[in-house]
Each structure stands twice: as C-alpha cells, then as structure tokens.
Amino acid sequence: MPEPIRSDNLSSPSGPSASDEEDSPADYIVDINCNVPAWQKWASPLEAWVQASMQALRMPPGEISLYLTDDADCAVYNERFRGRTGPTNVLSFPVPRPDGDALHGPRLWGDILLSYETITREAAEQGKDFEAHLVHLLVHGLLHLQGFDHENDAEAAIMESHEISALAQLGFANPYRLDEEHA
C-alpha cells in the first residue's frame, strides 16, 4: 500500500516556503480519457488542476490516468469494484507499489474516474460552484491513490483535513463548511 502523506508533509495554506524544493507540473503526468462530450471543455483545465493538486498534496512525481465519464459507465464500475448499486462522483483505483525503492522513473499512482452527471447534480444541490466541487473531488481521489480512506470517523477527519489544506492552497473554500450551510 502506498505510504500516505502526513500533515507535517503538507505545505501550509499560504504555500510552501522559498526553501522548499518544489516539483514542477511537468513532473506530474496526467493521461486523460474522455468518453462524454460534456467533459471536453474541462480536459485542459483538469490536467492543470490535477498537476496543481498533486503539488499541493506534495505527492512525489508520477503519473495518473483520469477517466471522464457519465453516470451509466460509473455505475458499472461502482458495482463491479465496490459492490454498490448506482453511480458515484469519484472512484479511485490505486496501483499497488512493490516494497522497496528499487523502482526507477515516475511512480504510477493509479486511475481516477469522475462522473459528470453526478458531479453536476451534487454541485447544484449543494449550492457549490462546479469547478470548486470538481477540484475537491480530484483532491479526494488523489488522497485515495495515496492510501487514505474514510471508512470511519477518525479516517474521515484526517482525510478531510488534508482536503481542506490542499484546497486552500489552490484558492478554494472549505467544502465541508458549505455542506454544513446547506444541511
């Protein structure tokens, strides 16, 4: 299992200090597979958001695949891999990493699947900007690729704190505060 990031490894909401060594966006490779026309206009912005999110989370350089799809396709993956009926907003499929540091080259992090219809519907229902909700789900998916989960309250609190910190670095508000306002 990949070693998760730690809160002391995240930069502060104001960004990294000048002494921190930064990976450049070129160190993060994003392969985008888009089978839904509604996603087309988001392909380039998504690539940039994924790279910026990986930097904000201080992920080591590597590659991810982003699969932009719809509810029908997402429901198939959700049933097959999670045993849950119906679509969801984001699914993450981490690539297992062999023990040791003997691997060379960029790390293969895994795949993230995003469902346009569910994300659009959730953003409208929760009174959120589509792009803000989308970037939140990207960060959420990237944390799953690093081994984070939210199966219980303690895990969820840790994951949410990383999401809030990364989103603040990217210029987005705390998405959970917005959820509380619309509850």
Feature annotation, model-predicted:
Residues V139, L143-H144:
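Short active-site segment of divalent metal-dependent hydrolases/proteases
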Residues M1-L134, Q146-A183:
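An acidic/histidine-cluster motif and surrounding catalytic segment
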